[in-house]
Amino acid sequence: MAGMKGSRKARRNERGSELIELAIVLPILLLCFAAIIDFGFLFQRYETITNAAREGARLASLPNYTVADVQGRIANYMAASGLSGGPTPYVNQTATRTLPSGQTISVAEVVVWYPAGMTYLGPIAGLVGASGHGSMMLRATSIMRAEAAASGS
């Protein structure tokens, strides 16, 4: 019976230790979750500009489309995806690339930039006195082989 009394006393001395452990670990977990959410939004923006660049390159690779047409397609795609503004995309419809075989081909190249302003760690950054605001320039490039204009017979 003496052993039972000692274990009860030891258990009584450990009361509240779970709360202290939770108080130590919870802020770290919240920071991790906030970072996952913030970087998820950043990745979504990156995927959007990548797809916009691909749409632009697809149109730029076709004959009879102007740079303004391509830039309009990119702007429409980004607006439909919830992103607006940003610098004018770079479009080069007369670029060339050399294949490993030595053959030179005509390609259309499109580069899209987007300033991704975001709040790092959401409102949690304010709790520790940080502003939590920052911005980075996302960039996506798409290159597609240019199609030749059909010749009339």
Protein language model regions, located:
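Short, conserved structural patches
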Residues: A2-K5, R54, R58-S153
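Alpha-helical assembly-interface signal, strongest on the long, hydrophobic N-terminal helix that forms
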Residues: A2-M78
